[in-house]
Amino acid sequence: MKSGRFIGVMSGTSLDGVDVVLATIDEHRVAQLASLSWPIPVSLKQAVLDICQGQQLTLSQFGQLDTQLGRLFADAVNALLKEQNLQARDIVAIGCHGQAVWHEPTGVAPHTLQIGDNNQIVARTGITVVGDFRRRDIALGGQGAPLVPAFHHALLAHSTERRMVLNIGGIANLSLLIPGQPVGGYDTGPGNMLMDAWIWRQAGKPYDKDAEWARAGKVILPLLQNMLSDPYFSQPAPKSTGREYFNYGWLERHLRHFPGVDPRDVQATLAELTAVTISEQVLLSGGCERLMVCGGGSRNPLLMARLAALLPGTEVTTTDAVGISGDDMEALAFAWLAWRTLAGLPGNLPSVTGASQETVLGAIFPANP
């Protein structure tokens, strides 16, 4: 069974940077050693945003974007190796999620697409890469997402305490770690995505630092109710979503009924949308004693305060409190999934994704010996 140093690479739907994590992994433990966040050039970020919202590309443009993202991920890995004074031979493999650009797990031909050419990463780092983690699960009838609940269960499940892990990235997803029950998990809806998109358009800021804009505004209740009527929120699990659904166009369609509103009030309403849709799903799933939050949203003081207020009797904390950096959780999970793949172990949970069976995930891109 392969064990040793692994690197996880994650570029999420929030597009706030490439997260790279170095960890030692074996069958008994996952020990994080180092991490860094690598910036995404504005031009690349905009290209990804455009394709996620349905802008048409030529095959040439699509191929160039795939190559550029692969090079970006390789640069991020090499920066971490240099910082840690490590060589390619010191790393067993890289687990790279890729950049999600489309996710459509239902319909006549279900599919999901994460780009960033893994061959570029192998060529530029000299390290074996495991990628394309989601499509095997979809081929077996699953949603292909979320995949991180399996990792949350391995690290954070408790024998008697009802726990849930909440990742608030661009999309928010919930892992249900309830003693005596199969692991559950699904996307609750928008996390930071709509909040980030709004303040980017209104103020040219990548995100609402310390929720300053949202805290200066007031929730527009009719707008909130209008957004909460979206059928995704009442759809039963298993379910997953992404930027191709909850994007700026989605927000604009709801705002048409509310002309002339204060931009800060919209920001406050979007924060409340995220908090309400998460808390409703926690309660509908039977509630928990401890909700452990990770991802960029765990740094949003307004979101954390609203979750605590909407979930009385639940201890709302961050995964940092149990020794796992909330900023690095997803990248660490894909390092672990790479280890599972090389060990020939399944990486999905049918109770989460709805797949017909457990399966080894991903494709292996071997480095030269």
UniProtKB/Swiss-Prot annotation:
Protein EC: 2.7.1.170
Pathway annotation from the record: Amino-sugar metabolism; 1,6-anhydro-N-acetylmuramate degradation; Cell wall biogenesis; peptidoglycan recycling
Catalytic activity: 1,6-anhydro-N-acetyl-beta-muramate + ATP + H2O = N-acetyl-D-muramate 6-phosphate + ADP + H(+)
Gene Ontology molecular function terms on file: ATP binding; kinase activity; phosphotransferase activity, alcohol group as acceptor
Pfam families cross-referenced by the UniProt entry: AnmK
Keyword annotations: ATP-binding, Carbohydrate metabolism, Kinase, Nucleotide-binding, Transferase
Positions that bind ATP: G12, T13, S14, L15, D16, G17, V18, D19
GO BP annotations listed: 1,6-anhydro-N-acetyl-beta-muramic acid catabolic process; amino sugar metabolic process; peptidoglycan turnover
InterPro entries for the chain: Anhydro_N_Ac-Mur_kinase (IPR005338), ATPase_NBD (IPR043129)
Function: Catalyzes the specific phosphorylation of 1,6-anhydro-N-acetylmuramic acid (anhMurNAc) with the simultaneous cleavage of the 1,6-anhydro ring, generating MurNAc-6-P. Is required for the utilization of anhMurNAc either imported from the medium or derived from its own cell wall murein, and thus plays a role in cell wall recycling.
Family per similarity comment: Belongs to the anhydro-N-acetylmuramic acid kinase family.
Protein name: Anhydro-N-acetylmuramic acid kinase
Organism: Escherichia coli O139:H28 (strain E24377A / ETEC)
Taxonomic classification: Bacteria, Pseudomonadati, Pseudomonadota, Gammaproteobacteria, Enterobacterales
